[in-house]
Amino acid sequence: MISKIISKIIIACLIISSQTTQAQTADSILLKDIVWDKTAPAGMTELSIPSENSKIAGFMYSANGAQKHPTLLLLHGFPGNERNLDLAQVIRAHGWNVIYFDYRGSWGSQGQFSFENCVQDVKNVVLFCKKYSDSLHIDTSNIALFGHSMGGFVCLKALAELPGIKKGFALSTWDIYSDSKDLKPSQVKEAAKQMGEYFILNTTSEKLIKSVMANLSFFNIQNDAGALANKEIVMLDEHHMNQQLAASLKNSNNNYFDYEVWQTDHPFSNKR
């Protein structure tokens, strides 16, 4: 049995599920050094990715070998202090490329930050992967998403809007809809104060909240249950606030859906 460790869960879902032989221990699944390919060794490539009229900063941990590799996109939270790059190294060691990027208006990327723009950024990164699939050795038939916190919301929303992507991992998903649906206009300033002013460009916390309130249906992931029905989805939480959302998605899912609540903190510090 795979223990409740994020990296082992991801390896099991991404790699083992596509193999015929599963007689491996948890440690042999996880611990694997890279033996460099002499002609196309594993490495890191800096990326400047177009998204609408802006450039977003990113990089790719490229897998070993000149063949095209399946690729995982890491989607950070708000503002995105936990990047999960430890997981990226493990996944790369098992033959996957891993792309990390910063949404528009965050952490040095150009443009305006908004939750809606984050979802569009994922779609534009996928287009970038397709355009440069040969030079970056990306198997565009096998791209998966991994999101944490706000990135969990972005993961599920983008997964619903990208029919060619079949797998998503949503870690401690921020249910923006549930947090905003009962908010009154008179409460916006206080909510913005509690949210704080993070390092984001060309917007404010108050504007972000007002944008959500003006487009609540977009943020209700349960509205996307049909589009997610044939996806493979893993949702992990450290709390029980997403149980209703998870139950709704699971009831509509025809492929694979797993939801678990672990004893940990928001960044899953003891479950790497």
What are these regions (language model features)?
Residues 25-66:
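N-terminal cap/lid segment of alpha/beta-hydrolase-fold proteins
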Residues 208-272:
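Serine-hydrolase catalytic core
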Residues 136-149:
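Alpha/beta-hydrolase fold nucleophile elbow
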Residues 113-136:
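Alpha/beta-hydrolase active-site loop
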Residues 91-110:
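Conserved alpha/beta-hydrolase
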Residues 25, 157-207:
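Hydrolase active-site cap/lid region
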Residues 77-90:
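The serine-hydrolase catalytic nucleophile loop
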Residues 68-77:
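Short beta-strand element of the alpha/beta-hydrolase
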